[in-house]
């Protein structure tokens, strides 16, 4: 199995080390981060299993080169653009592991509106910040979900402390936006109710 990664090469190294993929392609649009990634790959002894490419998103990765696509370390809107621009994104054999740093709700909105199913969702921390991780694949089923479900879908903030931490961060952000937007205020209220 081959994985392709756009963003940070850390996840791809971990997947190779634990045997989740035989080979991988790490891609970045900027030469300097790609060079640092190559150095890290070489230092970890995985240069025979991980290829690094200068690529705008998934542009330089063909459909037969990867089954699992990891896109991490950027905003949800950019992640959705990368998926939308890849000609193989609607191949039902592809799995997208997505870790948006910001605007995860916009990524969720895009996924549902464009026929992707969210198979699993969880949360993780990095640098003392909490983020969501989404496993999605193309199903062809377009869904409309409520504004609050864009934040809550697949999470259980009442029983999972990491999920709660993520939702609490979303509530804080929504309350900052609520002064000029009543939808944000109502969504924040619903999210707060989810962990009471």
What are these regions (language model features)?
Residues 12-21:
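Conserved SAM-binding loop of SAM-dependent methyltransferases across substrates and taxa
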Residues 19-20, 42-47, 89-91:
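Short helix-capping segments at alpha-helix termini
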Residues 22-23, 49, 95:
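Residues at the starts of beta-strands that form the adenosine-phosphate
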Residues 27, 31-66:
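S-adenosyl-L-methionine
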Residues 66-73:
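Short SAM/SAH-binding signature in class I
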Residues 1-12:
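Single conserved hydrophobic/aromatic residue that forms the stacking wall/gate
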Residues 15, 37, 50, 79-83, ...:
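Hydrophobic packing residues within well-ordered alpha-helices of enzyme cores
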Residues 59-60, 65, 77-196:
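Class I S-adenosyl-L-methionine
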């Amino acid at each position: 199995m081959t994985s392709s990664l756009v963003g940070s090469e850390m996840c791809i190294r971990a997947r190779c080390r634990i045997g989740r993929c035989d080979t991988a392609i790490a891609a970045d649009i900027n030469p300097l981060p790609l060079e640092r990634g190559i150095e890290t790959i070489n230092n970890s002894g995985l240069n025979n299993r991980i290829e690094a490419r200068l690529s705008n998103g998934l542009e330089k990765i063909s459909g037969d080169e990867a089954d699992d696509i990891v896109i991490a370390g950027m905003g949800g809107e950019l992640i959705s653009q990368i998926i939308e621009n890849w000609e193989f994104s609607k191949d039902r054999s592809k799995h997208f592991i997505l870790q948006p740093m910001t605007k995860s709700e916009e990524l969720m909105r895009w996924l549902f509106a464009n026929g992707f199913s969210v198979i699993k969702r969880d949360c993780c921390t990095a640098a003392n910040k909490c983020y969501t991780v989404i496993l999605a694949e193309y199903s062809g089923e377009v869904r409309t979900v409520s504004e609050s479900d864009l934040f809550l879908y697949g999470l259980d903030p009442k029983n999972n402390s990491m999920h709660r931490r993520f939702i609490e961060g979303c509530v804080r952000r929504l309350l900052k936006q609520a002064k000029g937007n009543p939808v944000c205020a109502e969504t924040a209220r619903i999210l707060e109710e989810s962990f009471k």
